[in-house]
From Swiss-Prot:
One of its GO terms (cellular component) is DNA-directed RNA polymerase complex. This is Putative DNA-directed RNA polymerase subunit 454R. GO terms for biological process: transcription by RNA polymerase II; transcription elongation by RNA polymerase I; tRNA transcription by RNA polymerase III. PANTHER family: DNA-DIRECTED RNA POLYMERASES I, II, AND III SUBUNIT RPABC1. It comes from Invertebrate iridescent virus 6 (IIV-6). Pfam families: RNA_pol_Rpb5_C. Keywords: DNA-directed RNA polymerase, Nucleotidyltransferase, Transcription, Transferase. Belongs to the archaeal Rpo5/eukaryotic RPB5 RNA polymerase subunit family. Component of the DNA-dependent RNA polymerase that catalyzes the transcription in the cytoplasm of viral DNA into RNA using the four ribonucleoside triphosphates as substrates. GO terms for molecular function: DNA binding; DNA-directed RNA polymerase activity.
């Protein structure tokens, strides 16, 4: 049932720079390589048949959502994703991400026309914003004088790479043309 989405989830974790350290039939555990934190951090992917299992005690016994052990909990379900289930994503502030099984049937980054996406490092992003985004402060409010192309946080590519608001993304097309987007 999850064979294709299981493989795509592994590819997604590897594309994020995470190292798969353990896997079984319905779980993938990965070590998150972080530049900022020297303590080991982990991400876990769980494959479940229905969204009812998300609320049930068995899942909360397996994954402690308040724990700092996991920086990312990816849930892939085959049932319908209700608004109550989507609220879990919002209330955990990006720690939990929920994908429907059908959304992970193809690796969108491997499509032959898909450009390359690279997140700028923190220092590079800071310099980029300083150079290209003009703003002023008026009455204590920051006013942006020059808008910049953006990418929604809910964009499939942003979700695939787990881009966060404020990230600057360098996009390189197959012909070598480079453009930038800021995740909103």
């Amino acid at each position: 049932m999850f064979s294709k989405s299981y493989q795509i989830t592994k590819e997604m974790y590897e594309a994020r720079g995470w190292q798969i350290i353990k896997e079984d039939e319905l779980t993938i555990l990965a070590k998150v390589n972080s530049r900022e934190n020297t303590n080991p951090e982990f991400a876990i992917a769980k494959f479940i048949k229905t969204t009812q299992e998300i609320k049930s005690p068995p899942l909360s016994q397996i994954i402690d959502f308040s724990s700092n052990e996991y920086v990312c909990v990816t849930i892939i379900c085959d049932g319908s994703i209700t608004t109550n289930v989507k609220k879990i994503e919002q209330t955990t502030k990006g720690k939990v991400e929920i994908f429907h099984n059908k959304d992970l049937q193809m690796n969108i980054t491997k499509y032959h026309l898909q450009p390359l996406f690279n997140k700028l490092l923190d220092e590079e992003a800071k310099d980029f914003k300083k150079k290209y985004i003009k703003c002023k402060i008026e009455n204590g409010k920051k006013i942006i004088l020059q808008s910049f192309p953006s990418m929604s946080k809910s964009d499939p590519i942003a979700r695939f790479f787990k881009y966060q608001s404020g990230d600057v993304i360098k996009i390189t097309n197959k012909d070598g043309f480079v453009s930038y987007r800021i995740v909103k």
